[in-house]
């Protein structure tokens, strides 16, 4: 049995969890999310908690894989409950001279030192805000109830100009430490 999987998920007030045909649907003030759960995992909703247990009679013979699925689906359902009640937020910072970002609705316009601007259409589930203050690096603030989608979009944005190790220029998460290298002049002595 998975250590993570056997922990119960408490359902906060204002959130409803339903189960139909191995699909768990979570509705809350921030939105609605659905997730298919493998038949090797049983889902039970009782007195304000969601419990996931392993189905011993499942067709899945590999016990290790069943244990892994147990922890995986518990984490996915827990992320959905947190997402529809509180939401998720990630901040990206643009480090570099002339690096800018502006948004028009759900379209972000990036100026990242290339000969052309990069435009990115965001999914409708993600809310975006850009901040540019004098003498500070521009920020992109992304919010969503879907943790997986938010992380995927942030990784895509970061891939436009990954931080380089010499000067640290590029797009990075706020609080992310970039491993720095000394230049060739430091190693020549």
Curated annotation (Swiss-Prot):
Signal peptide positions are none
Q: Which GO cellular component terms, listed alphabetically, does the Swiss-Prot or TrEMBL entry include?
A: cytosolic large ribosomal subunit
Any one GO molecular function term: rRNA binding
- What are the GO BP annotations of this UniProt entry? cytoplasmic translation
Tell me the InterPro entries matching this sequence. Ribosomal_uL6-like, Ribosomal_uL6-like_a/b-dom_sf, Ribosomal_uL6_a/b-dom, Ribosomal_uL6_bac-type, Ribosomal_uL6_CS
Answer whether the UniProt record assigns the keyword Transmembrane helix to this protein: no
Q: Which UniProt keywords apply?
A: Ribonucleoprotein, Ribosomal protein, RNA-binding, rRNA-binding
Paired cysteines (S-S): none
* Quaternary structure and interacting proteins, as annotated: Part of the 50S ribosomal subunit.
> Which family does the record assign?
Belongs to the universal ribosomal protein uL6 family.
Role, per record = This protein binds to the 23S rRNA, and is important in its secondary structure. It is located near the subunit interface in the base of the L7/L12 stalk, and near the tRNA binding site of the peptidyltransferase center.
What the entry lists under HAMAP family is as follows: Ribosomal_uL6_B
**Protein name, please?**
Large ribosomal subunit protein uL6
The organism's taxonomy opens as: Bacteria, Pseudomonadati, Bacteroidota, Bacteroidia, Bacteroidales
